[in-house]
């Protein structure tokens, strides 16, 4: 296999046995692909597909005026260029978006002509607001913050059949129902009631008999019965009836008389129940008619009206129950033939017939009126209104749309073969649904499972944005229709008709405040990726937490390979927010698909198919771990498979598909947990969730025991710098990498230079630090896709969320009681868990009524010492170390004239002092924060003079841009001249630049020539002359282009900023805060083993082994057995082996052993103990040495999920590292030097520091802000609040009779206003007495009682 630039430097020993059939797909594809389809950027108008924005426009346009004499048509749209790039948007706090310009055509028809002749056509581009762009990492920058739009899992449109699980009626009878759910429009429900009649509801309103809907559709009673029932035909013969016999219909009935065949042989005796055997005999005998007595038909229902043969008078309407009287009338009228409905109690119930009987309507109009009354109660119905309402409900494309998905699901469910069709319902659709419902009630067919992933689909960003856009367009449509009538007469242009505000507002609202548009979780690269791959059942059109039951939240068999069964939040959202499985993707309809290998006749092929939950149901799917021989044939006699959503075993020849990988079941976060298969599911859930909260440490440290997914996550998350094209590193420093691109990858006419600017010390959404460090050095060769710089939490292109710590599992003086963690001081000294947090503090100068606020260093009543970190503009220097209360930005606000004291008047008179009319409102460092200023940004409103600091910042930025562009030009020029040199050397010159005709050009000559002079050479070969001219033109073009670019950037920098109304200036100060680990911080492993640091012990007191190596962390062994996360123990053992092997390699390097020995030892590690084979022969000696140097700290291992290291392999690794195979060793007490009495498990575990830091939670208050009504202190750290002393705490003090404590808690410490001020004064004066008064909350109580109309007064003595 080929190794990438970083893989070569550090190979991870992989224990997986199964081959990689398929790489893990790009992890952010679900976001990027969806939005790309929505915008269709870079596609020409002619090639626009009917999706996304284009589809939204086509669904609303053309807009036709009310009179029909004018129309506005949509032609196409184009997207402009963004005003700022992503970084500038974040800095300025604006949205990263492009202007949308739509070309529309206004057509005015001639009113006079009969055939609508066109009178006038105007075409124009209209601005329709801004559309946010997605960044290349799948996020949106909205008002300067990065946001993610989470995909939504909602019920697919279509038709669903269900029952009430016997909960509605006390008898426990199952009441079946059907529901047609469109993509947009009214819901249509059919349901049975306990008496077995069928009812219909529209939009969950009052129910009507279902026959009302059928009548409204234009069906007569007879047509309805004809559609739903077969008929029995009876012929009248004298005193008896003859039935046209269909033998199957007799099954289960009791014979009323003997049934004989033609020869007179009795087939069924009278009184016997007719069985399947009897029916076969009747079929064989070929009996076509059966004599039955007259009373056989009493109680049956007529299928068609019975008419008097002579007079045409109706004797019995259709759907009438036959009685003896009716039979007598029929006999009298000589009716010879009539038909009844065929019903029975087993599989053909009389439900529709019964419904027709309770239906009061008789014709279509009555039915329409009935529906109108139900939809619009209290409005007088008219024929037209009723018809319009009914047609608009389900048959108008504007109001109702099943969508392509809905139509496909609908047709599949009712058994049609075609999957395409109209977006609106038809009469046949409604009848087909009713038929299916009746069939299910009759026992044919089954109800749907709504939690099946074939019935739930994913709505991604693009689709939600399109819906929102359509909502905006529909709002515009109304306004346009009204203005179109004016356009006919007044000659308006399209621009005057369309107001883009509603569209822009709808889009802005969606991206800014929709429930699914979330502030990106940016703790570390994994949390970013997971957030973008999240699938939520909540949100508009989805479920609500309160209504979601247990079934929706549960793991469903169809989740396999589509949605992770492990990763979901704990708490109220459990099961409603899920994560996409590693290999899952959505299909064109939005259903989740999982990949499988095709198996033919027991042989596994390399063909891969993606199947949705519906498509895979009939397949027999083997697991990825099924044993295969060399030919790829399944060898076991019985293979463990999934079939019809059940786990079972089948013979190899029955198998049709096979999983592609064992990790296709779990999500990205879960696939990063080594030995996941040994952890309990609940702990694995905590483990995957806590990895997302890990704070990037100062120096990232790759996990010694990983799973092999680390590289994919780091690469796809976008925090690393990945080479866009291969080439040679031309120059590299801490802030940028310049690559000279390989000739074969350079497109014609472009520079062939890629400049990568690195992100340095930037703030993330969670205030962690984003910083990139280059991995390459000058002259290195990189290929496309290689990782050139590490980001936060990545180490050589691998995800590195924490640190490898030497842990021992043993109790230690009670310091690790209840999951506490005992740390060694060495961890703090080595800055292993030191993290950098960046805080942004903002100071805003506004225009007030009394005059503008000013930012300056001239602040009243502030000493010199407080100002020594500010420059003359009043803004803190970059690099200043500041602490709580320090001034960062000096700001003064004018205050109203107050009454002056005589002293002030005197001062005023003497000095003309005006210091008193402003107050100090400077930006100060908040309490508990200490750090270094790393950056300052100043934004000034247009027309306000910029201060010296703003100008200095601008100059610095311009210098950087100029340096970048010069560098680019230098490389372009260099590359061009290199190509010229190779062409010119050895060629014959004609003259120019002081050369004689016929001289051959040499390298030395060119070196001595100024570059500008090269172009004066005249060559004998015309092609060379042409090349020289082209080169000269190319270089001057580039120069011009780069100058233009610089001017453009300069213009952007110098133009004023677009600030909120009333804001003159904004200063943003960025503080870098360094946090060491300390007691109270939360730490965790990757197996859900979390704890709080309880104590940091001196190194010399920690337990150590026989060599004197102390452990870093002591964990409590009692945390393992009851929690069943044994993965952490296996990780510890394998980690010990990894570290031991690293130490062994280090000793070999120190002893300067031969490279051959190193090579042999590395081959032993990588190729002799299980797992993947590594090709070390392709490494040169230098590369082997570099590899060995990188392995000194430990040989990283990969134990993939469900395909990891076996116990025997861990032991073999320990043996190879010369360590005890038990993984346990004798430890000594650091304080006494005594040996502990039994061996202890010691090894290396990967520990994370979570973003729950004690510094952020620590909080204390003496006095502060109070609530307005109750006068009690506010709550919470953000409000600088107090601790609530609630009713249960009051009971506790009452129980102990602590009267004085209780009194001060309820009065002076809380809401006795006078008492607390007096108390504060007393304490200041050193007098510790209190005088409690009346608590304010008592007054509130009195007011509340008075508001009930009860007069209450407190009588004071």
Swiss-Prot record:
UniProt-listed GO biological process terms: DNA-templated transcription
EC supergroup of this enzyme: transferase
InterPro entries membership: DNA-dir_RNA_pol_bsu_ext_1_sf, DNA-dir_RNA_pol_bsu_external_1, DNA-dir_RNA_pol_su2, DNA-dir_RNAP_su2_dom, DNA-dir_RNAP_su2_hyb_sf, RNA_pol_bsu_bac, RNA_pol_bsu_CS, RNA_pol_bsu_protrusion
CDD domains assigned to the protein according to its UniProt record, in alphabetical order: RNA_pol_B_RPB2 (cd00653)
GO molecular function: DNA binding; DNA-directed RNA polymerase activity; ribonucleoside binding
EC id: 2.7.7.6
Keyword Transferase attached: yes
Keyword Ribosomal protein: no
Keywords for the protein's UniProt record, in alphabetical order: DNA-directed RNA polymerase, Nucleotidyltransferase, Transcription, Transferase
GO annotation, cellular component aspect: DNA-directed RNA polymerase complex
Annotated catalysed reactions: RNA(n) + a ribonucleoside 5'-triphosphate = RNA(n+1) + diphosphate
Entries under HAMAP family matching the protein: RNApol_bact_RpoB (MF_01321)
Quaternary structure and partners: The RNAP catalytic core consists of 2 alpha, 1 beta, 1 beta' and 1 omega subunit. When a sigma factor is associated with the core the holoenzyme is formed, which can initiate transcription.
Similarity annotation: Belongs to the RNA polymerase beta chain family.
Described purpose of this protein according to its UniProt entry: DNA-dependent RNA polymerase catalyzes the transcription of DNA into RNA using the four ribonucleoside triphosphates as substrates.
Name of protein: DNA-directed RNA polymerase subunit beta
């Amino acid at each position: 296999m080929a190794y990438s630039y970083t893989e070569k430097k550090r190979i991870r020993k992989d224990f997986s046995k199964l081959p990689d059939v398929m790489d893990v797909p790009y992890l952010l594809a679900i976001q990027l692909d969806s939005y790309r389809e929505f915008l269709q950027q870079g596609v020409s108008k002619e090639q626009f597909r009917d999706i996304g924005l284009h589809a939204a426009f086509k669904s609303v346009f053309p807009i036709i005026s009310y009179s029909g004499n004018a129309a506005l048509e949509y032609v196409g749209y184009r997207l402009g260029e963004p005003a700022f790039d992503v970084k500038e948007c974040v800095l300025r706090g604006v949205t990263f978006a492009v202007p949308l310009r739509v070309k529309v055509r206004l057509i005015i028809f001639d009113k006079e002509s009969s055939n609508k002749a066109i009178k006038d056509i105007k075409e124009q581009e209209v601005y329709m607001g801004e559309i946010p762009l997605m960044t290349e990492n799948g996020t949106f920058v909205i008002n300067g913050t990065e946001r993610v739009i989470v995909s939504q899992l909602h019920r697919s449109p279509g038709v669903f059949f269900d029952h009430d699980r016997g909960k509605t009626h006390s008898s426990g009878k199952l009441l079946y129902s059907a529901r047609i759910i469109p993509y947009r429009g009214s819901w249509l429900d059919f349901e049975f009631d306990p008496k077995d009649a069928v009812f219909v509801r529209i939009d969950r309103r009052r129910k009507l008999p279902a026959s009302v809907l059928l009548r409204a559709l234009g069906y007569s009673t007879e047509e309805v019965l004809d559609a739903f029932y077969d008929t029995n035909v009876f012929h009248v013969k004298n005193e008896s009836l003859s039935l046209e016999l269909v033998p199957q219909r007799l099954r289960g009935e009791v014979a009323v008389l003997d049934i004989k065949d033609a020869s007179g042989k009795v087939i069924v005796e009278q009184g016997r129940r007719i069985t399947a055997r009897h029916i076969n005999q009747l079929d064989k005998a070929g009996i076509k008619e059966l004599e039955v007595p007259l009373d056989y038909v009493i109680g049956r229902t007529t299928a068609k009206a019975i008419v008097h043969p002579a007079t045409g008078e109706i004797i019995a309407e259709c759907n009438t129950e036959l009685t003896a009287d009716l039979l007598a009338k029929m006999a009298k009228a000589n009716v010879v033939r009539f038909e009844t409905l065929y019903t029975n109690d087993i599989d053909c119930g009389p439900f529709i017939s019964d419904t027709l009987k309770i239906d009061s309507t008789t014709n279509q109009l009555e039915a329409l009126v009935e529906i109108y009354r139900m939809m619009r109660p209290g409005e007088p119905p008219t024929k037209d209104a009723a018809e319009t309402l009914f047609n608009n409900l389900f048959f108008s494309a504007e109001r109702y749309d099943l969508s392509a998905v809905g139509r496909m699901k609908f047709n599949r469910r009712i058994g049609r073969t075609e999957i395409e069709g109209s977006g609106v319902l038809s009469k046949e659709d409604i009848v087909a649904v009713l038929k299916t419902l009746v069939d299910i009630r009759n026992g044919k067919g089954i109800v749907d499972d709504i939690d099946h992933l074939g019935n739930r689909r994913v709505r991604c960003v693009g689709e939600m944005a399109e819906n929102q856009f359509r909502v905006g367009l529909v709002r515009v449509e109304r306004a346009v229709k009204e203005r179109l009538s004016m356009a006919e007469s007044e000659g308006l242009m399209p621009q005057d008709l369309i107001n883009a505000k509603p569209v822009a507002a709808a889009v802005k609202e969606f991206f800014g405040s929709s429930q699914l548009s979330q502030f990106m979780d940016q703790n570390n690269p994994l949390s970013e990726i997971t957030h973008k791959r999240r699938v939520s059942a909540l949100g508009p059109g989805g479920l609500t937490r309160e209504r979601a039951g247990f079934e929706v939240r549960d793991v469903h068999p169809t989740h396999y390979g589509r949605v992770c069964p492990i990763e979901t939040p704990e708490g109220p959202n459990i099961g409603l927010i899920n994560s996409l499985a590693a290999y899952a993707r959505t299909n064109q309809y939005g259903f989740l698909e999982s990949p499988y290998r095709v198996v033919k006749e027991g042989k596994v092929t390399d063909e891969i198919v993606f199947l949705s939950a519906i498509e895979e149901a009939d397949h027999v799917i083997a697991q990825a771990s099924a044993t295969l021989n060399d030919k790829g044939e399944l060898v076991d006699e019985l293979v463990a498979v999934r079939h019809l959503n059940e786990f079972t075993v089948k013979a190899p020849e029955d198998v049709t598909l096979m999983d592609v990988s064992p990790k296709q079941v779990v999500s990205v976060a879960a696939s990063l947990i080594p030995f996941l298969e040994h952890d309990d599911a609940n702990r694995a859930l905590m483990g995957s969730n806590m990895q997302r909260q890990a704070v990037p440490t100062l120096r990232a440290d790759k996990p010694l025991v990983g799973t092999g997914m680390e590289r994919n996550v780091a690469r796809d998350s976008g925090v690393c710098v990945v080479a866009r094209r291969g080439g040679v590193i031309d120059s590299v420093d801490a802030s940028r990498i310049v690559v000279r691109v390989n000739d074969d990858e350079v497109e014609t006419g472009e520079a062939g230079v890629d400049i990568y600017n690195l992100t340095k010390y930037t703030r993330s959404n969670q205030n962690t630090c984003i910083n990139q460090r280059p991995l390459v050095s000058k002259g290195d060769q990189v290929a496309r896709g290689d990782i050139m710089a590490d980001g936060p939490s990545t180490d050589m292109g691998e995800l590195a969320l924490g640190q490898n710590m030497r842990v021992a599992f043993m109790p230690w003086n009670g310091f690790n009681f209840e999951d506490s963690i005992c740390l060694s001081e060495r961890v703090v000294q080595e800055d292993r868990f030191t993290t950098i947090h960046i805080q942004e503090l903002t100071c805003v100068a506004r225009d007030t009524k009394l005059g503008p606020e000013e930012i300056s260093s001239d602040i009243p009543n502030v000493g010199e010492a407080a100002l020594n970190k500010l420059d003359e503009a009043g803004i803190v220097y970059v690099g200043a170390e500041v602490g709580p209360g320090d001034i960062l930005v000096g700001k003064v606000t004018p205050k109203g004239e107050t009454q002056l004291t005589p002293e002030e008047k005197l001062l005023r008179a003497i000095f003309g002092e005006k210091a008193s009319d402003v107050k100090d409102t400077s930006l100060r460092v908040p309490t508990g924060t200490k750090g270094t200023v790393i950056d300052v940004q100043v934004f000034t409103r247009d027309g306000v003079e910029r201060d010296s600091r703003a100008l200095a910042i601008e100059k610095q930025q311009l210098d950087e841009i100029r340096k970048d562009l010069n560098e680019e030009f230098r490389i372009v020029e260099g590359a061009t001249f290199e190509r010229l040199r190779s062409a010119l050397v050895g060629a014959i010159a004609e003259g120019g630049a002081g050369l004689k005709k016929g001289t051959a050009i040499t390298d030395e000559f060119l070196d001595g020539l100024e570059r500008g002079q090269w172009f004066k050479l005249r060559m004998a070969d015309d092609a060379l002359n042409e090349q020289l001219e082209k080169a000269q033109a190319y270089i001057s073009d580039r120069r011009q282009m780069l100058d233009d670019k610089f001017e453009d950037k300069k213009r952007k920098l110098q133009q004023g900023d677009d600030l909120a109304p009333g804001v003159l200036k904004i200063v943003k100060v960025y503080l870098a805060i360094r946090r060491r680990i300390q007691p109270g911080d939360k730490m965790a492993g990757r197996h859900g083993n979390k704890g709080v640091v309880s104590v940091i012990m001196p190194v010399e007191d920690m337990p150590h082994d026989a060599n004197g190596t102390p452990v870093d962390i002591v964990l409590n062994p009692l945390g393992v057995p009851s929690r069943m996360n044994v993965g952490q123990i296996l990780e510890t053992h394998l980690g010990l082996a990894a570290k031991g092997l690293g130490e062994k390699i280090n000793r070999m390097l120190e002893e300067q052993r031969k490279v051959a020995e190193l090579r042999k030892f590395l081959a032993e590690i990588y190729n002799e103990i299980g797992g993947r084979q590594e090709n070390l022969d392709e490494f040169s000696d230098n590369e082997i040495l570099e590899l060995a140097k990188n392995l000194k700290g430990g040989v990283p291992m990969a134990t993939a999920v469900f395909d990891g290291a076996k116990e025997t392999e861990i032991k073999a690794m320990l043996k190879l590292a010369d360590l005890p195979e038990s993984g346990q060793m004798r430890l000594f007490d650091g304080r006494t030097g005594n040996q502990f009495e039994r061996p202890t498990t010691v090894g290396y575990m990967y520990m994370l520091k979570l973003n729950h830091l004690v510094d952020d939670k620590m909080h204390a208050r003496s006095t502060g802000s109070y609530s307005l009504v109750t006068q009690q202190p506010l709550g919470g750290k953000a409000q600088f609040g107090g601790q609530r002393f609630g009713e249960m705490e009051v009971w506790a003090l009452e129980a102990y009779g602590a009267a004085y404590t209780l009194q001060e808690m309820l009065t002076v410490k809380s809401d006795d206003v006078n008492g607390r001020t007096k108390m504060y004064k007393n304490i200041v004066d050193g007098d510790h007495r209190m005088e409690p008064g009346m608590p304010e909350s008592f007054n509130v109580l009195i007011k509340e009682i008075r508001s009930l109309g009860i007069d209450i007064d407190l009588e004071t003595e």
